[in-house]
Amino acid sequence: MELIQCIDEMQSIAQAARANGKRIALVPTMGYLHQGHASLMVEGQKRADLLVASIFVNPTQFGVGEDFDSYPRDMENDMRIAEAAGVDLIFAPRAADMYPADYQTYVNVEELTLPLCGANRPGHFRGVTTVVAKFFNIVSPHVALFGQKDYQQLAVIRQMVADLNMPVEVIGMPIVREADGLAMSSRNSYLSPAERVSALCLSNSLNAVRTAFCKGERSVAALKNLVLDMISKERCAAIDYVEFRHGLNLAAVDTADEQTVVALAVKIGKTRLIDNRVLGEE
């Protein structure tokens, strides 16, 4: 496995691979890898001849007062996990190369970025789509893999790819959870032991909603109250949003069906966690 930091070098490798008829898969990450990331890499290996994982804590998707400076970083461990998962190249560019002093071009998906995480994180998705578009141009992947834990992000990237006619197949992969149900996240490392227990209110409330839905409840108001009641019992939990949305276009819904996605953002102590559940999926 190689570590590439130079953009020009990465582009040259990708162009040569394509010229030789190789399929390229890309797994974009911000590092501090866990088994959720590894699952994307294992799937990427099945779908391509050259598997590239990017590791880049992207400054343009963090807002003022967010955790860019404190975001966990561990390149040595990341390289171990990536290599074990079958990654051929790690692309870890420097921020100064990705965004030089005279940088002024951004990609913005308009409507899908307004609700959910976009409502309280202005500019976040503009940063996400810009860096992903840059990675697509640099790595030239045939396929790119993203986790469904960031459900809105996946929808936004799919919209960007469709709107801009990017020749990339975007694959969404299921959420990988800890044994007790907590969705794997690099930010879980911020949690104290007590907060780690409290954080289970996210997955537990999603499971409760799924159970109620399977028993016939279709009222979004009733299902939402179930989530709110469960999370509000945790003293260190502060709800950012609890939303029921159409699974494809993220439009708000009043009546739940199998395509409805329940999306949560909750602060546990100082740590903002997200999770989601599509009601029609096991």
From Swiss-Prot:
Keywords: ATP-binding, Cytoplasm, Ligase, Nucleotide-binding, Pantothenate biosynthesis. GO terms for molecular function: ATP binding; pantoate-beta-alanine ligase activity. It comes from the Bacteria. SUPFAM superfamilies: Nucleotidylyl transferase. InterPro entries: Pantoate_ligase, Pantoate_ligase_C, Rossmann-like_a/b/a_fold. The keyword Ligase applies. GO terms for cellular component: cytosol. The active site is at 37 (proton donor). Pfam families: Pantoate_ligase. It is found in: Cytoplasm. GO terms for biological process: pantothenate biosynthetic process. ATP binds at residues 30-37, 147-150, 176, 184-187. Beta-alanine binds at residue 61. Pathway: Cofactor biosynthesis; (R)-pantothenate biosynthesis; (R)-pantothenate from (R)-pantoate and beta-alanine: step 1/1. Its EC number is 6.3.2.1. (R)-pantoate binds at residues 61, 153. It catalyses: (R)-pantoate + beta-alanine + ATP = (R)-pantothenate + AMP + diphosphate + H(+). Catalyzes the condensation of pantoate with beta-alanine in an ATP-dependent reaction via a pantoyl-adenylate intermediate. The reaction proceeds by a bi uni uni bi ping pong mechanism. Homodimer. Belongs to the pantothenate synthetase family. NCBIfam families: panC. This is Pantothenate synthetase. It comes from Geotalea daltonii (strain DSM 22248 / JCM 15807 / FRC-32).
